[in-house]
Amino acid sequence: MTDHSPAPAAQDENRLIAERRAKLSKLREAGVAYPNDFVPDAHAADLHRQYGEQDQEALAAAGVQVKVAGRMMLKRVMGKASFATVQDGSGRIQIYLDRGTLGDEAYAAFKQWDIGDIIAIEGSVFKTNKGELSVHAATARLLSKSLRPLPDKFHGVADQELRYRQRYVDLIMTDATRRTFETRSKAVGSIRQVMLDAGFLEVETPMLHPIPGGAAAKPFVTHHNALDMEMFLRIAPELYLKRLIVGGFERVFEINRNFRNEGVSPRHNPEFTMMEFYAAYADYRWLMDFTEHVLRQAAIAATGSAVLTYQDRELDLSRPFDRLTICEAILKYAPAYTQAQLDDAAFVRAELKKLGADVDGPVLARAGLGALQLALFEETAEAQLWNPTYIIDYPVEVSPLARASDTRPGITERFELFMTGREIANGFSELNDPEDQAERFRAQVEAKDAGDEEAMYFDADYIRALEYGMPPTGGCGIGIDRLVMLLTNSPSIRDVILFPHLRRED
């Protein structure tokens, strides 16, 4: 016979929840259980900053009165007096409560409160004999009853999924998690300000697309009932942003979400944040210089330095980023190869097969030399690109939206930026020849028909926009989540997304 009774830990939690619900019932009977008439006038961090260095006598003489509120994280009842620690959005402050000041009824009520409850305190700022800044409570109120007990310990691999699934608990319990998302906000704020200072206009483009475009990726598909048409969550905003360049906005950018119905890994989440920007009369060389500036300023704003530490290794964004062609990178990081070998498509295909690549699959079966070289780069060199490195001169066949080189047949004016072995940004001089773009779209459709799920669709309206004339333009996309991973020393993309996607909970 199978025993479906709860585990001991679950039984304890259920008992505690039942006890707290009983307390809530008494609060309801007594009046308003969740009052909303208290407004704090001070935060913990501000109190520490303003009064942390003052001594007992100075604070006593000043008679500073404050109103604070937050979650009770610690509670020590010692007869007629008690201490509690309240955590607000800025930090923690100790509260001293005594029966003589509060009165018998209020003090008895406080003793019934639980860790996790949201409480409000009015009182005076003072220092204990041990020198800890505190608030001596003149009044204490319960604002919000916590029905679930907070975990005693909230760290380690065993709790990792719980952190992602119940981020609200993680944020309550883990200072480092809160700092991660504060750092993220600083980085995004810096990027936005740098773009505005450079004369870019921030815009919003559609999230629902009639045709997915702007990247090689598998989209999420949905249906618009009123219009009775299939639609796609956007995989990239690129084609809409370039329509705006056609329309006369010479510098535009967007910070928003993209969606790709692909795998989940420490570097991939189906929903992720990108910053894409486009500048008329700019080429890929200007883009590389400007992207360096954007990332360097984001690092300084978020961490105070352009020299980072990631996974115990230095990552220096203060120096000019390296620039290598695909073949130069292979020869540098896999020096057993020669340029002659890399120029031999049959040799490269054979090497890829040795390395386990699916050379007969829909992507590589039809690949030319450039695409094969790129695949070999991904197998041999990409993971070794620790310091910021631009890989340049991508082949036309894997760059359907990039401008072709005027001097090197088959090569585009495109780059990808790598740090710590990960792609951080992708940019290029934009293809603004409508006839060339139409031909490349047709080649993408053929690839899709041959089984390449990530190949692009033919976007006739985008071709029509180009036919009105788009000025010479450069554009780039920066992966915000991966950048924040570096800025916060986070090993997984889930660590820097507030609510990452997970399998359904059992």
Curated annotation (Swiss-Prot):
It comes from the Bacteria. Its main location: cytoplasm. Keywords: Aminoacyl-tRNA synthetase, ATP-binding, Cytoplasm, Ligase, Magnesium, Metal-binding, Nucleotide-binding, Protein biosynthesis. GO terms for cellular component: cytosol. It holds the Pfam family tRNA-synt_2. Mg(2+) 1 binds at E416, E423. Disulfide bonds: none annotated. GO terms for molecular function: ATP binding; lysine-tRNA ligase activity; magnesium ion binding; tRNA binding. Its EC number is 6.1.1.6. It catalyses: tRNA(Lys) + L-lysine + ATP = L-lysyl-tRNA(Lys) + AMP + diphosphate. HAMAP family: Lys_tRNA_synth_class2. Belongs to the class-II aminoacyl-tRNA synthetase family. Homodimer. This is Lysine--tRNA ligase.
